[in-house]
Amino acid sequence: VSVSSQNKRFIYKVLLKKVQWSDGVAVTAQHFVDSIERTLNPSTPSKLVDLLYVIENAKAYREKKIPFSSVGVSAKSDLELEFILNKPISYFAHLLALPIFYPQRKEAPGKVTTGPYFLKEWKIGEKFLLEKNPYYKDFPEQAPKQIVFQIIPEEITALQLFKTGKLQILTKAPYTDLQELQKKGLVRSFPFR
């Protein structure tokens, strides 16, 4: 990272030379810019958009006062991403770890991923089918090649499938059965932060 003397201009070398989307297209600095533009777009609902207001002119763009080209984020090259901030902030590097800074593809929103799996099939109200991303580096050998998320609206039906081993994960159990599941060591709780 290169930082200006006023701590307002940051140039990041995107160390993603070999990272590819699930369709084989290389990830570039422009994909990060596209993500920020989408989040700042006034028609995009976002609970985290205020965090982007540290970037020069981001709020003015969100308020439709200026074009996106005036916002302090740009791709200097395929591998260089520049941010210009309104003022120096010590926590800027931490903000970059938030999902609003993850890369996105304008031409294929929601259809490609850089993660270990991609959405192969979605049957509304029935299931999601995730498949191994063939371009994901270091995919664990023991990891499943496919993951199926079944949507089962009735809690009691889902519980029966779980008890008989036909479901590996149960995200919601009837309260009356919770103690039994806890005694068997089948309950794990992960608080949301």
What are these regions (language model features)?
Residues 1-8, 15, 112:
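N-terminal lobe/hinge region of extracytoplasmic solute-binding protein
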Residues 11-15, 26-33, 38-104:
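Surface-exposed binding/hinge segments that line
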Residues 12-14, 129, 148-151, 168-172, ...:
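Structural recognition of the beta-strand scaffold that forms the well-ordered cores
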Residues 24-26, 31, 156-166, 183-184:
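Short helices/loops that flank or line small-molecule/ion binding pockets
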Residues 29, 33-37, 70, 127, ...:
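Extracytoplasmic/secreted envelope proteins and their assembly/folding machinery
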Residues 37-45, 97, 135, 163, ...:
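Sec-exported extracytoplasmic/periplasmic mature domains
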Residues 64, 68-70, 78-79, 84-146, ...:
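Gly/Pro-rich hinge or "lid" segments in bacterial periplasmic/extracellular proteins
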Residues 141, 171-193:
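Local pocket/hinge segments that shape ligand/substrate recognition
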